[in-house]
């Protein structure tokens, strides 16, 4: 089974579903973490950390930092999203659905019951060339808010219901209490347009991922069972449903993804918590400044240690997990493969640190290791086993430590150099064209009147 294979869809259909779910999830944040991502990329978490913070503030002030359009999610007729311009048709979503709840100028839907009113969700549609509705996408935003209320909204959106219900209770009740009416309206709208639950994709990140798991758990007993066959992909969810109804995607070194034992809080939640679950990816590592630094790792790995949260950012998931999807090694990867990703590697750290499997704060890694580089000039080091190394773009330096590694050079891979290479009777392969994920995708856009 491939890393992101879901239900019985097959590899190519699962890839398309994953790409759509990622696009929907990133859209729900309206590019919220762009400021930090830019500052971190330029300055990292070391001595440049203060510059990273300055970049966050600067990015949130500058008109030029408005969220761009996300390819594959907006309709052809819809102009790029900006903070000042209301996109054509966006506000029509609520009226098109026949929904009377709270909605803002962006078309974002808000929680319906007291104590949950700052929860936020998006409803998007996918259409054919004739304008016929093909699929509906539901995206739940994580514990955050729009950029203009960056502090106040997160403080209200998730903590209050979490304190009241606890993880297990929150997971069971979140969707019913926050968007029960909206989800009924969407189900009625979908049925009126000839769609079934199989035509609905539900996605979200962090607390939004928890909402995805909550909706999946309730899908058979609520909303007349309409959503029982829907597709559920959650990113960085602190809770993971049992069974295979939800694909829970997360980094091994994301403290939020590893906070709970399924839906139970225990003492291990405050430290290293690496239990495998049926519905989760368990060995994908975001090789970032924190993971690589011996100094940063003197502090305990914990959800209470804010420096570990660099692996939790939406942008880290959008870029990193897409690298897995587009890798030439994808066919060789499985759900339990050890995969090291470094697209969230800052420029200062990239210049003098070797990307490798450090196996930090986790159960021992076994089997083959896949290391996928970034678009920059990476230093990549294989281990003693049979590693699969793909440098990516840029001029990479790759160190071979075993003589049993497989190297993939594809597309615009730059001027790469291998040191310590020990031939074992066969050569690394060099395709003439970049491996591609050749699937037909239609854009997601607002529900139309």
UniProtKB/Swiss-Prot annotation:
Residues 58-77 are annotated as: Disordered. The keyword Cell membrane does not apply. InterPro entries: AB_hydrolase_fold (IPR029058), Hemolysin-typ_Ca-bd_CS (IPR018511), Hemolysn_Ca-bd (IPR001343), Serralysin-like_metalloprot_C (IPR011049). Ca(2+) binds at residues 318, 387, 396. One of its GO terms (biological process) is lipid catabolic process. Keywords: Calcium, Hydrolase, Lipid degradation, Lipid metabolism, Metal-binding, Repeat, Signal. Hemolysin-type calcium-binding repeats lie at residues 372-389, 390-407. The active site is at residue 206. It catalyses: a triacylglycerol + H2O = a diacylglycerol + a fatty acid + H(+). Belongs to the AB hydrolase superfamily. Lipase family. This is Lipase. It comes from Pseudomonas fluorescens.
């Amino acid at each position: 089974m491939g890393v992101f294979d879901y239900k019985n869809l097959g590899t190519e259909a699962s890839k398309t579903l994953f790409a759509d779910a990622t696009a929907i999830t990133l859209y729900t944040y309206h590019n919220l973490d762009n400021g930090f991502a830019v500052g971190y990329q330029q300055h990292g978490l070391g001595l440049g950390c203060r510059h990273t913070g300055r970049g966050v503030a600067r990015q949130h002030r500058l008109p030029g930092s408005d969220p761009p359009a996300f390819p594959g999610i907006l309709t052809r007729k819809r102009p790029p999203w900006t903070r000042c311009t209301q996109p054509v048709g966006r506000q029509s979503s609520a009226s098109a659905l026949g929904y009377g709840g709270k909605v803002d100028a962006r078309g974002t839907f808000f929680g319906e019951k007291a104590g949950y009113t700052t929860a936020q969700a998006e409803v998007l549609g996918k259409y054919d060339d004739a304008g016929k509705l093909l699929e509906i996408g539901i995206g739940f935003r994580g514990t955050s808010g729009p950029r203009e209320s960056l502090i106040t909204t997160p403080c209200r959106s998730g903590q209050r219901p979490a304190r009241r219900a606890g993880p297990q209770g929150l997971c069971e009740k979140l969707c019913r209490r926050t968007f029960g009416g909206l989800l009924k309206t969407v189900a009625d709208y979908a049925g009126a347009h000839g769609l079934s639950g199989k035509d609905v994709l539900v996605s979200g990140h962090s607390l939004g991922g928890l909402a995805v798991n909550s909706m999946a758990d309730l899908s058979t007993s609520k909303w007349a069972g309409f959503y029982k066959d829907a597709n559920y992909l959650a990113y960085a969810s602190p809770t993971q449903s049992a069974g295979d109804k939800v694909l829970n995607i997360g980094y091994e070194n994301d403290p939020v993804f590893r906070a709970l034992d399924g839906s139970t809080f225990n003492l291990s939640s405050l430290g290293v918590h690496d239990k495998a679950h049926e519905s989760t990816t368990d060995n994908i590592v975001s090789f970032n400044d924190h993971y690589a630094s011996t100094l940063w790792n003197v502090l305990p790995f914990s959800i209470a240690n804010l420096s570990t949260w660099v692996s939790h950012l939406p942008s880290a998931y959008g870029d990193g997990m897409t690298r897995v999807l587009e890798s030439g090694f994808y066919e060789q990867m499985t759900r339990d493969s050890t995969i090291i990703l470094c697209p969230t590697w800052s420029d200062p750290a990239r210049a003098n640190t070797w990307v490798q499997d450090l196996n930090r704060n986790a159960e021992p890694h076994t089997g083959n290791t896949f290391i996928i580089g970034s678009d920059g000039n990476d230093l990549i080091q294989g281990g003693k086993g049979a590693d699969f190394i793909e440098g990516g773009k840029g001029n990479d330096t790759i160190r071979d430590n075993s003589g049993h590694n497989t190297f993939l050079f594809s597309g615009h891979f730059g001027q790469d150099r291998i040191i310590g290479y020990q031939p074992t009777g066969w050569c690394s392969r060099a395709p003439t064209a970049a491996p591609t994920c050749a699937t037909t995708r239609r854009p997601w856009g607002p529900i139309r009147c």
